[in-house]
C-alpha cells in the first residue's frame, strides 16, 4: 500500500471505506496536489485515530496506526501538524454529515414510539479547549458565581436518535452564540415526518416549537412553570387541549414521586406539551413515561466526553483546529454506534441500550493497533462479537444525587432529597392534574422597575471612551478608572474588537468604532 498504508481505522474502516474518504476529499478540494509521504487520505484516518487515543501525542498515535504494518516509517510531529493544517475542518465536517443519521430499524426495541422515531435535541457544553488567546477570542470564558471557568468550552448542539444514541447532526457555536434554540434551529432541516422530538425546558419557545411543526415532525417538550396556557377542553385521560400562538397542543400536568429502596422519596411537577392530540392513542401516563427517553442524549454525551475523551482537554489552540478535532470525534463516535447497532440487530428483540460503548471502543482500539479486518466483508466482525458477548443487563430504574465535583458549579451542593449513592427505584407514582377551564388568556400585568438596571460593563467602558472618542485608550487605563480586574477586561476588549465594536490601534490600545452623535447613552 506504500504511503497509504496508515490510512485505516482497523475494523471500523468497513464503515468508513477509503473510497468514501477519497470522494469527500475530492468534493471539498482537499486532496493533495502531488503524492506525498502523508497524503490527505492518511490525514483523515490519523485525525480519527487522534480522537480514539486522546491521551497520546501525535507520534504515539501514528505508532498505533502502523504497529501492525511492517516497515512503515514514522514522520516527524511537525509533518503531522502540517498535515492537519493542510486538511482543515471541511473534509471532517463533510464526512460526519455523510455518516450521521438514524441507525435503528423501526422494529428494533426502543427506536420508535407507536410508529414515531424518537429523537432529542440538547446542548453539550463541557468539552474543554486549551486556554489559548485564540480559543478565548472565539469561545469566550464562562463566568460562574465564584469565578471564571478554567478552560474555554465548546458549545455543541446535537440531534440524537434516542433509541440507538446515534447522531443525526450537530452544530457548533462560539461566545456570541450560546443560545440552545438558536443553535438547534440550524438542525431543523434534519427532522422528518414520522419523528417525535423530545425536548427539555430550554426549548420551550413558541417560535421554535412552531418551526419544528413546520418540518412535519411531532414534539413532546417539558414546559416552563412560568407558562400560563389556556385550558380549552378537558380530555378523559386528565390532559387538556390548549394553543401556543396559532399552534394546537395538548398538555399533561403531572406530579411524579419516585421511591427508592432505601425509603428516599424524590418528586417534581412536570408540564408536558405535545402535538400528539389523540389522547386515546397517546394517553397521558404513557407520555409521562416516554419523556424519560430524552435522557438517552445525556448518555450519548457521557460516551463522548468521558468514555472516549476520559475528561481530557482537546488538543487544538485555534478555531479551525478545534472544529476539525470536533468533527473527527463526532465521526468516530458515529462509527462506533454503527458497529454496535449492526451487532445488536442480529439478535431480534435486543434493545440497543444494552450494548456496551466501552467494549466497542476498546475492541476498536485493539483492531487499529493490529490493523486487522480492514477489508473484511464480515460486518459483525470482532467488534460486534465482543459487544454481543458483553451485553449489559436490562436497565433498571435508579436515581442518585446530582452533584458535580467543581466548586464553581451550580450542582456542587444539591439538596433535593436524592440519595448520595445510586439507588434502585421501587415505585413511581404519577398523579395527573387537570386545571380549571379557561376561555380567555390571563390579563398581562405591567411590572415597573423601582430602580433602573445598573449599566453593563460594556456600556461603562464605551461611556468612558466616548469622553475622548478620538484618542486610543489603553486597556489597563480603562480597567483602573472603572475599577475592573485588568485581566478580565482585556479579554473582553479582545472579544468586542472581534465583534467590530472596537478597533485595536496598537498593542493594548483601542478606539470605539461608533462615537456618539447625541447625548443618548449607548446601550448593549
Residue ranges and their predicted role:
Residues 450-458, 474, 504-524:
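Short, cationic-aromatic polyanion-contact patches
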Residues 484-495:
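Short amphipathic alpha-helical interaction segments
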Residues 40-43, 454-462:
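Short, leucine-enriched amphipathic alpha-helices that occur as contiguous helical runs
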Residues 470-481:
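Short acidic, hydrophobic short linear motifs in intrinsically disordered regions
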Residues 75-140, 213:
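Active-site- or DNA-interface-adjacent structural scaffold in DNA-acting proteins
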Residues 1-58, 86, 95, 115-116, ...:
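Single, function-defining residue in the core of a domain
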Residues 500:
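Glycine-centered, phosphate/nucleic-acid-interacting loop/turn motifs that mediate DNA/RNA or nucleotide
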